[in-house]
């Protein structure tokens, strides 16, 4: 089974990203062969910035994305969205990478389920 998560919201300020990134590793835990891809778009690309510092006791989206990667998932970012926000490849957390609409289209076609947050 392949699930694609498309995340549009900023990493903090709403709980959409938080909830998406809680569900992604839960799917892999229930089904170890489950393939998860997280595609970050719009303000969602900010979720993959390296070295996030959140208050003690507050969730950290970078750590949550690392759990996706540890479960053999992928974290892809819309390159156009990155450019619009002045985010460079060097600012990304390890394992996350710039992507394209063509790759998103291919990933969408290959996915069994697509969840949009």
Describe every region a protein language model picked out.
Residues 54-80:
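A glycine-rich helix N-cap at a beta->alpha junction
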């Amino acid at each position: 089974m392949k699930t694609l998560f498309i995340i549009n919201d900023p990493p903090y300020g709403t709980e959409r990203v938080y909830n998406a990134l809680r569900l992604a590793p839960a799917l892999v835990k229930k089904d170890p062969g489950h393939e998860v891809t997280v595609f970050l778009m719009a303000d969602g690309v900010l979720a993959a910035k390296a070295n996030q510092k959140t208050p003690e006791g507050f969730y950290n989206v970078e750590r949550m994305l690392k759990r996706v990667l540890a479960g053999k998932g992928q974290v892809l970012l819309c390159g156009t969205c990155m450019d619009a926000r002045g985010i460079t490849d060097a600012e990304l957390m390890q394992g996350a990478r710039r992507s394209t609409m063509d790759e998103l289209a291919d990933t969408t076609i290959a996915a069994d389920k697509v969840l949009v947050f």
